[in-house]
Amino acid sequence: MEPEKQTEISEFFLQGLSEKPEHQTLLFTMFLSTYLVTIIGNALIILAIITDSHLHTPMYFFLFNLSLVDTLLSSTTVPKMLANIQAQSRAIPFVGCLTQMYAFHLFGTMDSFLLAVMAIDRFVAIVHPQRYLVLMCSPVCGLLLGASWMITNLQSLIHTCLMAQLTFCAGSEISHFFCDLMPLLKLSGSDTHTNELVIFAFGIVVGTSPFSCILLSYIRIFWTVFKIPSTRGKWKAFSTCGLHLTVVSLSYGTIFAVYLQPTSPSSSQKDKAAALMCGVFIPMLNPFIYSIRNKDMKAALGKLIGKVAVPCPRPEQLLDVYHVPGSLLAARDTEMHPIPYPGGVQSLAGNRDME
């Protein structure tokens, strides 16, 4: 069969995580719960940073952006997966497929760049504490963030434009639960040599640069910390970067565990596992990691929740219900006995000693 032109293709079909009907309810419940926790957790982090002036620092500025990117990354794949499970359909429009691929690589790569920028922030805070406010001023933070968005957007745009030039067979099934770059290339009937070269080039430059930056930053951080004479000083220095190091270990540990293995027929399952961990579960865990041992963040979250919580009524606010004179409320050993009467409910204040 002749492959149809890409412009004539209306949709692809996603293989999903499981084709067994008995698994669909479990998958829907699990990923809906995960997605709701991700949205609520990251939204609380974002609102806490916005509303608490004590968190208006470079470190929390980058954490704000990380929470935003994690929310967008999870929203790229999970809602469509839930919709397909609910509708018992595996179809995704061709344009929607390219859009999903663009967004996933944009936010996924941006996540790595933000982790690298946060490593630079921790490097400056520990190695050059006296110059921290000068080196990490607002223009510098804005420049680091803007450059990261520009590079990641350029990479995703080039991948998407090159993919749009390829031809595919109608009714092709993507061996994944969302539209990813490599599974789409495997379905193309065109020459993908250019695409593969671009993927390799970006993998070397964009893929390894954030990790190299993180690695070099922490080598310098550890070298500086080990020279601190007191154990308390070392612990205090390590505590400022421990949470970030936990997230980095989760992210890159997953990638290394999945891809630094011999190629096997189950490579598509490895791709799914890595995508689930990096695109679904780590964005859900990040708010807990950054708040559970962070006193400043816990205090900000406490203030935020206190503002939105419904306040309990004070005793004097109940006067309109019980019609008790204020002077009696000040008396000791008194209690109120609501009794019915034709017009409604009234109360009498009685002294226990007189009963």
From Swiss-Prot:
GO terms for biological process: signal transduction. GO terms for molecular function: G protein-coupled receptor activity; olfactory receptor activity. Signal peptide: none annotated. It is a multi-pass membrane protein. The keyword Transmembrane applies. The chain crosses the membrane at residues 26-49, 58-79, 101-120, 140-158, 196-219, 237-259, 273-292. Keywords: Cell membrane, G-protein coupled receptor, Membrane, Olfaction, Receptor, Sensory transduction, Transducer, Transmembrane, Transmembrane helix. It is found in: Cell membrane. Its main location: membrane. One of its GO terms (cellular component) is plasma membrane. Odorant receptor. Belongs to the G-protein coupled receptor 1 family. This is Olfactory receptor 1I1.
